[in-house]
Regions:
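A short helix-loop-beta-strand connector motif used in the catalytic cores of GNAT acetyltransferases and
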Residues: 1-9, 18-20, 70, 91-98, ...
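N-terminal charged segments
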Residues: 1-58
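Conserved acetyl-CoA-binding loop-helix of GNAT-fold acetyltransferases
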Residues: 32-36, 126, 132-145, 149, ...
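Conserved GNAT acetyl-CoA-binding A-motif
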Residues: 42-51, 147-159
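Conserved catalytic-core motifs of GNAT/GCN5-like acyltransferases
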Residues: 47-51, 66-76, 158, 173-191, ...
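Conserved active-site alpha-helix within GNAT-family acetyltransferase domains
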Residues: 54-65, 137, 149, 161-178, ...
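Acyltransferase donor/substrate-recognition loop-hinge adjacent to the catalytic core
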Residues: 62-104
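A conserved beta-strand-loop-helix scaffold within acyl/acetyltransferase catalytic domains
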Residues: 90-127
Length: 199
């Protein structure tokens, strides 16, 4: 996964099955937003906007297909901790991949990337048959412990509506709403209105 500055935000080369690349921008100006929308040209090109969207911004993204709504950017202070015994961490440069296996079967996983004093958590997932056992929290604890060892002091993540409760229970705080779009909205697909955005 490669990323680089793009205008006021970032362009991430995701190279995943559903996303080839993703633009990420925090409270872009209207001209910058229009530029980003024009670059979001296909269903595998995504645009994530952090911050509130006003009526003009909603008009600017009307041609795009909403992927998510109600999500939020969250942050926490990273403190030293022990990696739980059940969490296996594999490190590739500045990225750590955590996984928990139960009787040889993948039960939960996640990853985190450190840059300077910040660590970004991503793809935190518990497999359906292993949910409600606290495994997601163990993955987060393991990744936090690893990142503290690297010198990270601030954690960041993009939380889904369903994931927010887990992160809040671990001491994370929401700091801004976010919404993700992809290119190629169908003509009959509903757009995103003010009522669809987090309050």
């Amino acid at each position: 996964m490669l990323r680089r500055r793009d205008g006021d935000g970032w362009l991430v080369e995701v190279a995943a099955e559903t996303r080839s690349r993703e633009y990420i921008s925090v409270a872009p100006s209207l001209p910058e937003l229009r530029r980003l929308v024009a670059a979001t040209t296909a269903p595998d090109v995504w645009l994530t906007l952090v911050g509130d969207l006003d009526a003009e911004s909603l008009d600017a993204v009307a041609a795009l297909d909403p992927v998510t709504s109600g999500e939020g950017m969250m942050t926490t202070r990273i403190v030293p901790a022990e990696v739980p015994a059940s969490v296996r961490i594999e490190v590739d440069g500045r990225v750590a991949h955590a996984r928990i296996e139960v009787r040889g079967e993948l039960a939960a996983r996640g990853q985190a990337a450190v840059r300077a004093g910040d660590v970004v958590f991503d793809r935190i997932e518990t497999m359906p048959s292993f949910r409600r056992r606290g495994l997601g929290g163990l993955v987060m604890t393991g990744l936090s412990a690893w990142s503290a060892e690297t010198g990270a002091t601030t954690g960041l993540l993009m939380a889904s509506v369903s994931g927010r409760r887990l992160y809040e229970s671990l001491g994370w705080a929401a700091v801004a709403p976010l919404v993700t779009f992809r290119g190629g909205r169908r003509d009959d697909a509903p757009g995103l209105g003010i009522a669809d955005l987090p309050g």
